[in-house]
């Protein structure tokens, strides 16, 4: 972590950059993609790497319990792995173990972790995946978080203001598919017995985030690939491609992942506007983009439009938030979660990281079909008091810095 942050700090940056220490990265470094409890020596290495990352300036710890290898932790094993955070005040951000049928139990698990470690826990992109659960679980989750806060726990959440998400296509598979790592998975996807086992799990399984069952292949679009022969699939749903190619959607997915060495991303339509609105209204919520930056194919429009989309859609059009509430969820709330004392507010002595815009003109131009379009109406952006955007144009200024805890 120290070497990486030092290298980034030597790079001209137009914006500030901070890092969380990846819980999966740390476990992989200590024990690979192997399942089961960590042996004592691997657990000690996890502790050492966490402590080293925090000492080097990591803003917190990021967990992805729906992904391998972190999915292999039991709750108590996870608490043991995170022991260096006890009473530390260091935030743990978490993609929970489930966001579909088991999302409420997954949230209760993280409240157990918060109580055990007595350190802040922040739920990443809070949502309920699957039509059967839209409007059903979000009120219960927000009530659980509210009660936990009333009981003295430092817990919070964030969300992205879109009904579609984006991640790696391998995550339509059950987590145990990744035992041994992605190279091993690529080989296993060519084995008939493994494919049959995966198909059976995906047709019936409710103990993982089973996207093909929760939202259907028609709501899972291929967004990036690396091989030229597969580019015809980009921007189309697995169901559409399956029909056009005359191939079963499971076989199509297995074949595509194997041919691409698992380097395929997807855009998946997974959640409901009513749940977004409910989470936005929670005073302990922040708004994030959850954006990734693939070098080819289709981006998610949130890469270019996330913050403007919030202001245009949920302030001006739907009236879910006031302008002041929306700005708070983009600024002082996330700054507070990450312990960035100099960020997020307009006050004497605070860092001059500012945006100047006309609320009436703010407009997202990016779409799912054409995502690489800059938003309109964000006239000026100042980083450390230096204009990086002026009259809507990039100035070339590079006044960003590395943020360390």
Where does each model-flagged region fall?
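Acidic, glycine-enriched loop/beta-strand segments at the rims
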Residues: 264-276, 322-327, 335-371
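Active-site proximal loops enriched in glycine and acidic residues that flank catalytic Cys/His/Asp
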Residues: 65, 96, 125-127, 159-161, ...
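Generic structural signal for well-ordered alpha-helices
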Residues: 2-5, 50, 78, 82, ...
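Divalent metal-binding pocket/active-site signature
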Residues: 52, 58-110
């Amino acid at each position: 972590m120290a070497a990486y942050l030092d290298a980034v700090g030597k790079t001209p940056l137009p914006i500030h950059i901070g890092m969380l220490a990846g819980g999966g990265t740390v476990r992989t470094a200590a024990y690979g993609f192997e399942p089961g409890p960590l042996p004592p020596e691997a657990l000690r290495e996890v502790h050492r790497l966490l402590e080293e990352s925090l000492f080097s300036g990591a803003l917190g710890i990021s967990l992805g319990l729906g992904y391998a290898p972190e999915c292999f932790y039991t709750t108590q094993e996870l608490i043991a792995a995170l022991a260096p955070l006890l009473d530390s005040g260091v935030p743990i951000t978490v993609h929970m173990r489930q966001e579909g049928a088991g999302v409420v139990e997954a949230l209760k698990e993280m409240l157990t972790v918060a109580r055990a470690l007595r350190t802040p826990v922040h739920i990443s992109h809070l949502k309920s995946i699957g039509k059967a659960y839209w409007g059903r679980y979000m009120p219960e989750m927000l009530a659980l978080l509210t009660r936990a806060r009333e009981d003295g726990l430092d817990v919070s959440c964030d969300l992205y203001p879109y009904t579609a998400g984006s991640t790696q296509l391998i995550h339509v598979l059950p987590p145990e598919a990744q035992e041994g790592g992605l190279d091993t998975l690529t080989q296993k996807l060519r084995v008939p017995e493994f494919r049959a086992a995966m198909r059976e799990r995906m047709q019936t399984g409710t103990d993982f985030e089973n996207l093909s069952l929760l939202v259907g292949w028609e709501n899972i679009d291929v967004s990036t690939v690396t091989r030229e022969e597969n580019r015809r699939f980009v921007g189309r749903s697995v169901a559409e491609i399956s029909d056009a190619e005359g191939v079963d959607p499971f076989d199509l997915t297995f074949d595509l992942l194997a041919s691409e060495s698992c380097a395929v991303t997807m855009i998946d339509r997974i959640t409901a506007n009513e749940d977004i609105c409910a989470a936005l209204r929670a005073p302990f919520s922040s708004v994030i983009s959850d954006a990734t930056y693939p070098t080819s194919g289709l981006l998610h429009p949130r890469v270019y439009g996330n913050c403007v989309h919030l202001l245009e859609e949920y302030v001006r059009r739907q009236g879910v938030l006031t302008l002041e509430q929306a700005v708070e969820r983009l600024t002082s709330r996330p700054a507070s979660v990450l312990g960035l004392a100099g960020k997020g507010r307009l006050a004497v002595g605070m860092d001059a990281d500012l945006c100047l815009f006309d609320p009436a003109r703010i407009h997202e131009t990016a779409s799912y079909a054409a995502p690489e379009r800059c938003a309109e109406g964000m006239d000026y952006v100042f980083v450390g008091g230096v204009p990086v955007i002026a009259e809507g144009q990039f100035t070339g200024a590079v006044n960003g810095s590395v943020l360390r805890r």
